[in-house]
């Protein structure tokens, strides 16, 4: 069976991930007119720039959908977001600022939950608005086929017939008007935005040029912290975790994780926390650039890692970072539910997150400027009395340290021998000043 359909399968049911925007509206109407039977599925991901979800399925029906469903994905999205925090599943960082993989998390949830809903309706052909140059086309492909092995893919933007007729936004708008729908194109921004409850991605158009900065972006989850005219008073916030799960903000407990994430977004968003500018490597190995917002994820991540460093030992923390980066890359590639990802997730959640219980107090200022004011946990292995510089009882004596340092003589001797061995091989040059071989000035190599 052919998995990807290059042309519209007339007479068959086609599920379309319907956002209500111009692209999917025109595609749905066009498919109906060409003889297909479109079913519209809209994911409620708590997008901060969407204020009326119920209106989206109604519009789909007006444009010719056989049926239209709104699928509430918020609970599952937040659950996956918390799992990513527990595992440190983030691999794109620049200058200490993190991209929290909010779009890949949204695709993992959308790609599985919408296809599951389609399967319930007997719809086994799926279309969405992803383009052939991006990451989403592969993410949706993987998650769709994982959920429904009989699934076939039809994307209008891969169909030359659709492209020839409605290849641009102007053509789509004219098509909608000609069909009796007063659909005007929205005012074109200098960039494109995609969002869900966990974060927002701003990319493309002017942001493809590296001389366009964050200053052209109008945040939808935070504030323009770079604008000195925007008043942002400092604010103290306390975050509490129990066994790796965020349960309270400023002393207020939450039985609903969705409400907790919304409050975390509000707190972090007041300061512009979690906004970053990243150059990343797409799945196809081409580089792209994005401006990201994730105020709630950033707030929880900072508090979580503060507790992590105070509770776990050095090697466990090293494995958390190493495995977290591996897992983050798998998540980015659309492999969040693959066996290798599940293996990493299980280890990190079972042996690392389960011990993260405690409370962290921070002072948030502008953007990513913050201070940690206090860290409290019954699980802390940080014990100031063990290494105090003041006179008092200690868990080891000066003689103990002398013995420990003496044991280092063996590897120091080995290292000296290696350095002189490298010098004999011509890899290092001797230094009259220190008596130790040194790396030769590369500019003089071979002269």
Swiss-Prot record:
Subcellular location per the Swiss-Prot or TrEMBL entry: Cytoplasm
GO terms under biological process: argininosuccinate metabolic process; L-arginine biosynthetic process; urea cycle
Catalytic activity: L-citrulline + L-aspartate + ATP = 2-(N(omega)-L-arginino)succinate + AMP + diphosphate + H(+)
Pfam family membership, one: Arginosuc_synth
Listed GO CC annotations: cytoplasm
UniProt-annotated binding residues for L-aspartate: 131, 135-136
Disulphide bonds in the chain: none
Positions bound to ATP: 17-25, 43, 129, 131, 136, 194
Binding site for L-citrulline: 99, 135, 139, 192, 201, 203, 280
InterPro entries in alphabetical order: Arg_succ_synth_type2_subfam (IPR023437), Arginosuc_syn_C (IPR048268), Arginosuc_syn_N (IPR048267), Arginosuc_synth (IPR001518), Arginosuc_synth_CS (IPR018223), Arginosuc_synth_type_1_subfam (IPR023434), AS_cat/multimer_dom_body (IPR024074), AS_multimer_C_tail (IPR024073)
Molecular-function GO terms, alphabetical: argininosuccinate synthase activity; ATP binding; protein homodimerization activity
Keyword Cytoplasm: yes
PROSITE patterns on file: ARGININOSUCCIN_SYN_1 (PS00564), ARGININOSUCCIN_SYN_2 (PS00565)
The enzyme's E.C. designation: 6.3.4.5
UniProt entry keywords in alphabetical sequence: Amino-acid biosynthesis, Arginine biosynthesis, ATP-binding, Cytoplasm, Ligase, Nucleotide-binding
Pathway: Amino-acid biosynthesis; L-arginine biosynthesis; L-arginine from L-ornithine and carbamoyl phosphate: step 2/3
Broad class of where this protein is predominantly found: cytoplasm
HAMAP family for the chain: Arg_succ_synth_type2
Subunit annotation: Homotetramer.
Family per similarity comment: Belongs to the argininosuccinate synthase family. Type 2 subfamily.
NCBIfam families: argG (TIGR00032), PRK05370.1 (NF003779)
Protein name in UniProt: Argininosuccinate synthase
Lineage: Bacteria, Pseudomonadati, Pseudomonadota, Gammaproteobacteria, Enterobacterales
């Amino acid at each position: 069976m052919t998995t990807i359909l290059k042309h519209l399968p007339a007479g068959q049911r086609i599920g379309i991930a319907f956002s209500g925007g111009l692209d999917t509206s025109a595609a749905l109407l066009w498919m109906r007119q060409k003889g297909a039977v479109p079913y519209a599925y809209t994911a409620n991901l708590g997008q901060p720039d969407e204020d009326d979800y119920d209106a989206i399925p109604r519009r789909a029906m007006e444009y010719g959908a056989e049926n239209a469903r709104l699928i509430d994905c918020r609970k599952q999205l937040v659950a996956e977001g918390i799992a990513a925090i527990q595992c440190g599943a983030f691999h794109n960082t620049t200058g200490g600022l993190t991209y929290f993989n909010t779009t890949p998390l949204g695709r993992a949830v959308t790609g599985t939950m919408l296809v599951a809903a389609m399967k319930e309706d007997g719809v086994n052909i799926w279309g969405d608005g992803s383009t052939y140059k991006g990451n989403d086309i592969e993410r949706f492909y993987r998650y769709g086929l994982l959920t429904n092995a009989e699934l076939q893919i039809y994307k209008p933007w891969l169909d030359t017939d659709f492209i020839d007729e409605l290849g641009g936004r102007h053509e789509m708008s004219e098509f909608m008007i000609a069909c009796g729908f007063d659909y005007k194109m929205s005012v074109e921004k200098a960039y494109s935005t995609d969002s869900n409850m966990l974060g927002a991605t701003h990319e493309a158009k002017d942001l493809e040029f590296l001389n366009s900065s964050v200053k052209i972006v109008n945040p939808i989850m935070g504030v323009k912290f770079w604008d000195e005219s925007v008043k942002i008073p400092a604010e103290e916030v306390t975050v509490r975790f129990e066994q790796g799960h965020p349960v309270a903000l400023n002393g207020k407990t939450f039985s609903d994780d969705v409400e907790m994430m919304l409050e975390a977004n509000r707190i972090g968003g007041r300061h512009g926390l979690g906004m970053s500018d990243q150059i990343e490597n797409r799945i196809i190995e081409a580089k792209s650039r994005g401006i990201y917002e994730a105020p709630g994820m950033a707030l929880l991540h900072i508090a979580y890692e503060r507790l992590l460093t105070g509770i776990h030992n050095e090697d466990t923390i090293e494995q958390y970072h190493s495995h977290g980066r591996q897992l983050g890359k798998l998540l980015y590639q659309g492999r969040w539910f693959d066996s290798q990802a599940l293996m990493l997730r299980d280890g990190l959640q079972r042996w690392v997150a389960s011990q993260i219980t405690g409370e962290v107090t921070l002072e948030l200022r502008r953007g990513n400027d913050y201070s940690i004011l206090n860290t409290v946990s019954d699980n802390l292995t940080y014990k100031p009395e063990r290494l105090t510089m003041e006179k008092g009882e200690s868990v080891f004596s000066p003689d103990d340290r002398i013995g420990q340092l003496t044991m280092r003589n063996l590897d120091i001797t080995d290292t000296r021998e290696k350095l002189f061995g490298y010098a004999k091989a011509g890899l290092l040059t001797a230094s009259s000043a220190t008596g130790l071989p040194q790396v030769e000035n590369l500019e003089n190599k071979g002269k």
